[in-house]
Amino acid sequence: AGAQAIGANDLLAQVGAYYHDIGKLGKAGLYTENIQAQENPHDDLSPNMSALLITAHVKEGLSLGLLGKLPPAVTDIIQQHHGTSLVAFFHHKARVQNEAEKKRDGRPGLPSAPPINENDFRYPGPKPQTREAAIVMFADGLEAASRSLAKPTPAHIQDLVGDLIRGKIVDGQLDECGLTLAEIHRLREAFIFTLTSMFHSRIAY
């Protein structure tokens, strides 16, 4: 729906969406959509290691795409669908741990906590280079974020879509894809319509 709303290549966006996360296949248990609440493998890992493993699915996906001889336009989407986005959960977790270590640092004989390098918690990129790659970035982020909506009312869905798109703009993730502001607005409306339709049966008015 997003691609159609702005006259982008709808088929390419669909195929890119089908294949964008193939890099997760080898370690599926590490990702939120496959983790059971009682057994989270990240509980035993450092935030840095978790971020490294999570971001690796882009490189793994690109390798699988090339091995499977997918068209370059599709492997580009696999490589670009996270851009250089921040893995915010583990970056925040690392900062919390770092602050706790700093409070402890005043005690004799304990080493100083090393500073947090934000780049260690970012995807390698590149940023989306096409409108289709940006659409897959939006759709992927919204699919994940919408799962956390306890009450998917139209107002909450509008806020979710608006916040995600604004976040990508502020973070510079759309700087190289060629989307205009008018197209971004149309994409926002298309995603709001699609998500509202998907969650309609769950909304308690």
Task: Show which residues each predicted segment covers.
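Divalent metal-dependent catalytic cores for phosphoryl transfer on phosphate-bearing substrates
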Residues: A1-V161, G167-D171
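Long, hydrophobic alpha-helical segments that serve as membrane-spanning/inserting helices
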Residues: I169, L174-Y205
